[in-house]
Structure formats: C-alpha cells, structure tokens
C-alpha cells in the first residue's frame, strides 16, 4: 500500500517548478525583513510572478473564444485536504496512486492574505471579495473595501453584459462566499440584509442573480419580509427540495433547501440536492441565454468540517465538491466555450495527515479505513445522542468498526454533560486517533491554495498568482466577450 507512486504525468515541468518554488515563498515573502534576509525567496517570487504574467499576456494575444465562466470555490480546501482526498479515492488494488479529477486539471497556486490591520490570515469574506472584485479588504467585508465603499463584482459585470448569473452553495446562500459575489455589506453576519440585496439591487432593471440555490430559508422568510413571495411575484420559481428542483423548469429560480446550511453530504436525505445536482440544474437554466453565463459554486462545508476538526465530514464534503467540479468540466468539454476554474479561499483547521501516537511519538502513517467506516458524521451522531438515543447503539449503528470499550466510555462520559459539542468532540476524537489525523487550530491557516482549470483561457490562471488576480482575469475575459459580440 505504501509503495504506491504516481505513474502518470500530472502537469508540465514548468508548472511543477512553479509549485516547488511557490512552496518556498509561503507567507513570509510578504514580510520585508524576511525577504531581505532571504534574497533567494524574493527571486523565486519574482520568477513566479513573471511566469504567471507571461502566461496571461500570451493568452490575451490568442483571444480565446469564451462564452461562459464557471468559478468553483472549495471553502477551506487547503493542500492537505487535496492529499487526503486522493488517499480516500485511491484504488488499493492498483500499484499506482490514481489521480483525482482535481489532479487532472491542476494549473497553479494562489496566495490568500487579506488587507486587514489586525489579522494577516484571511476569512472567507475577504478572500471571496478579492476573488469577486479584485481588491484586498478586511476580514468580514462583503464586496466592500477598507473604506466600506462597494466593489463591483464579476457577477455584476456579467449581468451588465447581458449574461445570466447564478450562485450555488451548500451553506446559506447568503453566507460570506456567495454574498461577496452578489451583494455588498460591511459585515458578513448581516445575512438578512444580504438576502435583501439579492432582491433589491438591480442591474439594467433586472435582478442581478438569476439562479440562487443553497440553504438559508430563515434569511428569506422573516417576520418583516418574505423574499420568496417577492421573487415569485417577479417570475422566479421557488423550490425547497430535490424533487421540486428537478420538476421546475423556470430559467430563474430560488432554491432554499434548509433553514440554515444544508446537512453534510454524508448526512443528507435523498430529497436534498447535492452540490453536483445543484450545479447541473444551474448550468441547464443559465445556458439558455445566448449571451452566456457566469456561475459561482461553493463547496461551503469543507470549511465547516475543518473548523470542527471533523475528518469524516471533511472527506464527505470533498467528495461532494469534486463531483460538482466534474459536472462543470463535463459540461465544458461538450460546450467547448466554457472556462472552468476551481480553487479555495484558504485552508481550515491545520489538517495534517499523520500525527503523534498517545506516547508522543510521530506516526508515519495515515489511515483511511476508519474514516470510510463512518456512515454518518460525528455531528449527526451527537445530535441523536443529545436527543435521547442510546450512546453505544448509536455508535455501533453508524460506525462500521469494532469499537474499544474505552472509546464507547469516552462518549458516554461526554453524554453525561448534556453538551452536544463535547459529545461531538468525543466521537471526532475516535476517528482522528484511529486515522492518525492531526489538527492545529479551529480557525483558518495562511498557506497558498491550489488552482485548477479547464477550457479556453485557463492558462491565465496558471503558476503562482494572488487571489485578486482571479477577478482581474475574469473581468478581462468579460470585457473581451463584450467586445467580441
């Protein structure tokens, strides 16, 4: 098992060099003192910036024929998550370690830092604003700059161009990432106001977002306002489950499938659409516009799992998001005029594959078997237990492992506190210890994240780039599309 190697060529040598040098740069390259002390790092940074700039200029000369842009964000999906996902999907019967769909389309990395006086590690709002509007800003900002002035987003530019637009998320559709593409607010927590923006802010007399699919019903149906009724009056379809989504044929649709965020992929009922199903539904509707479309898709809860240090949920969400990415790629392959870019906003949790054993010795191993043994997330099991379910029965029903008496006892002791978080943590601890999964934080981490691409113009997103360049490139593409009409 541990002698597996890659036997396929993943990326060109130049790109491999880009990543190798990119790993040297890290966040310290932005510390002037460190850069002066390490001139080789500064040189590496300059080299990679030049390589990226050359790729951008070359593709601009070629003026690729792009009609649609699909931009996917795996929230919290740092490099360790990609490695873990590769181990999870590997075929143990083959000598090589198979590539994931992500691996097949790897093109570069991006930096993620915000422009915040107090914090140099980004949150989702600042990162999404950088990728949607091309400007650095403070943590918590929703498409506004440090002066709290609105920043135009690529989604808004697409709508100005006469294109159809869509947002898909497994969180509330008003959460930080989708909000930073379709709304403006000084703070991400103002999700009711963000929902209002989705309806109230018009472009050329039209609602700026044609397809909204995700969670967050509570932000749309409130005592002061029922936005679902307002959207329906304006011709939108309104759906609340997978069956209704499939049945509905409206080009404009509001789909709210949970009061808050959707359940984790492994926990979802059959009547809740997956990220893949929402993505396919959005593409089908948006593609009816002869002027093209812009779609942002977020795999929101990779991040939530990382905050919770829950490896079961994290791997479940990675699988869900990869299927959405593949759906976008499959459409682009048939369409020939669609650019697909996938990346992350940051990494979450400080996930490590391999950790210390109980004696403090480092374990040179990471095991997927305990993770694959889970039928549900620890969070799901904790909710059942807090609602009165028997601890041992719940664990044995949802974990296909022979549990140790001390593991069961640890959850029983947590259950005696009537604290759902402590129960959840006790169950997560079983999977983390069994799989040798480590975590350093319940927050975000500051490393670069991977970028993946397919379709015409993908080279503009290759090499080492900053997250603001995602928006800069898309704005350029949208302008060229407008001129080429």
Question: What name fits each language-model region?
Answer:
Residues 41, 45, 49-85, 131-147, ...:
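Mobile, glycine-rich extracellular loop/lid and propeptide segments
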Residues 13-15, 34-39, 61:
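Cofactor-binding active-site loop characterized by glycine-rich and histidine/acidic residues
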Residues 1-6:
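N-terminal secretory signal peptides that target proteins for export/translocation
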Residues 61-67, 77-82, 87-121, 125-129, ...:
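A post-motif C-terminal structural segment
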Residues 23-39:
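Sec-dependent signal peptide cleavage junction
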Residues 7-24:
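Sec-dependent N-terminal signal peptides
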């Amino acid at each position: 098992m541990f002698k597996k190697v890659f036997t396929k060529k993943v990326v060109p040598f130049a790109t491999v060099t880009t990543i190798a040098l990119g790993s040297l740069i890290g966040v310290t390259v932005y510390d002037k003192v460190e850069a002066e002390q390490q001139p080789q790092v500064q040189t590496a940074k300059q080299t990679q910036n030049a390589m990226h700039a050359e790729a951008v200029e070359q593709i601009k000369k070629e003026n690729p024929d792009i009609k649609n842009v699909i931009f996917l964000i795996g929230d919290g999906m740092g490099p360790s998550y990609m490695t873990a996902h590769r181990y999870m999907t590997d075929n143990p019967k083959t000598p090589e370690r198979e590539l994931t769909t992500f691996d097949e389309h790897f093109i570069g990395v991006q930096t993620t830092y915000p422009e915040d006086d107090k914090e140099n590690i980004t949150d989702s709002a600042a990162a999404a604003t950088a990728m949607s509007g091309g400007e650095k800003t403070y943590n918590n900002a929703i498409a506004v700059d440090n002066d709290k002035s609105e920043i135009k987003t690529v989604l808004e530019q697409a709508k100005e161009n006469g294109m159809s637009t869509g947002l898909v998320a497994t969180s509330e559709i008003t959460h930080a990432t989708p909000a930073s593409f379709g709304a403006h607010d000084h703070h991400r927590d103002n999700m009711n106001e963000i929902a209002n923006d989705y309806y109230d802010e018009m472009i050329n007399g039209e609602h700026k977002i044609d397809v909204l699919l995700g969670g967050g019903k509570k932000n749309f149906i409130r005592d002061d306002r029922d936005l679902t009724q307002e959207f329906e009056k304006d011709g939108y379809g309104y759906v609340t489950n997978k069956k209704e989504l499939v049945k509905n044929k409206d080009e404009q649709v509001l789909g709210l499938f949970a009061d808050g965020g959707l359940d984790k992929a492994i926990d979802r009922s059959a009547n809740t659409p997956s990220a893949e199903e929402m993505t396919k539904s959005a593409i089908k509707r948006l593609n009816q516009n002869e002027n093209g479309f812009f779609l942002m898709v977020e795999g929101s809860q990779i991040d939530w799992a990382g905050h919770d240090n829950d490896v079961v949920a994290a791997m479940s969400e990675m699988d869900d998001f990869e299927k959405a990415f593949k759906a976008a790629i499959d459409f682009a392959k048939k369409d020939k005029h669609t650019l697909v870019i996938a990346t992350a906003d940051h990494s979450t949790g400080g996930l490590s594959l391999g950790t210390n054993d109980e004696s403090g010795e480092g374990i040179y191993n990471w095991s997927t078997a305990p993770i694959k043994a889970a039928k549900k997330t620890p969070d799901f099991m904790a909710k059942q237990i807090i609602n009165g379910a028997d601890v041992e029965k719940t664990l044995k029903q949802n974990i296909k492992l022979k549990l140790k008496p001390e593991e069961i006892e640890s959850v029983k002791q947590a259950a005696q506190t009537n604290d759902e978080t402590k129960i959840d943590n006790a169950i997560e601890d079983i999977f983390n210890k069994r799989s040798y999964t480590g975590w350093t934080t319940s927050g975000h981490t500051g490393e670069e994240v991977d970028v993946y691409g397919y379709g015409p113009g993908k080279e503009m997103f290759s090499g080492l780039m900053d997250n603001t360049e995602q928006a800069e490139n898309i704005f350029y593409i949208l302008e060229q599309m407008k001129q080429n009409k």
